[in-house]
Amino acid sequence: MELFFRKIGNGAPLIVLHGLYGASDNWITIAKHLAEDYTVYLLDQRNHGRSPFAGSHTYDDLLTDLADFFTQQKIDKATLLGHSMGGKIAMWFAAHFPEKTEKLIVADIAPKDYLPEKNDSSFNLHQNILLAMQEIDFLLVNSRNDVDNFLEEKIDDVRIRRFLLTNIVKDRLTKQYKWRINAAVLYDYLDEIVSGVNKNRLKQKAPITGYPVTFIRGTKSNYILPEDKILIKEIYPDAKIIDIPDAGHWLHAEQPEKFIKAVLE
């Protein structure tokens, strides 16, 4: 699979891997700052953005996609920066290809299995989001506002709705609005996405010390809990853990300057 990507700057390669519902577009502002030190590659992952849709969405799929990207772009070694789902992919890739990993930077996700928490409000929210996305009849949609009005009945958080609306585009041929997210497949693979790269999968290769590791955590987020810091150190003994105050899960959007500083440390 050939992934859509944007390339900014000159320097050592840094690959940015977005999270669920994300796309390269969300990272352009951050990339412009990082491009002062790096050649930044912003990827759209499979089933997201302008990259191809596929019938499966496992972390092994995403690992293969990223390995193929290294080959296609003739990248020997790169710094990996992954947020949430992208952070899991970055950890999984680095564990398999330490020789290709210059540095691992993981934004607001832990190397643990989140599936036992699937009955919590966060898992249910993802289910509701992906179901709501599939229920929209775009034949009846004349504007993004129409979609927002429908989503408002299903999703209370206006910030989430605004984020989802960035994934609506107009088809060049039909002129109809459509999602650039493969919601049906993401829903089918939600258990895989949520469980992801956990300690048991990484433990076979732990302790991991072959490259520098930084975890960046939003203090208002519940994705990396205080006890998760112990887990991180078990797998990555030399890992640096940086807290960003007043930031939630989308820490790069909420505190961009502090986030950029943390990445460059």
Language-model regions, residue ranges each:
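The conserved beta1-alpha1 loop
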Residues: I15-G19, H83, R217
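Conserved alpha/beta-hydrolase catalytic His-Asp/Glu region
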Residues: F138-E192
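Flexible "cap/lid" loop of the alpha/beta hydrolase fold
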Residues: W92-A95, T101-R144
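Conserved HGGG/HGGXW glycine-rich cap/lid loop of the alpha/beta-hydrolase fold
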Residues: F4-F53
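Conserved serine/cysteine hydrolase catalytic core
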Residues: D171-I235, K240-D243
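Active-site loop/oxyanion-hole signature of alpha/beta-hydrolase fold enzymes
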Residues: K32, Y41-M85, I89, H96, ...
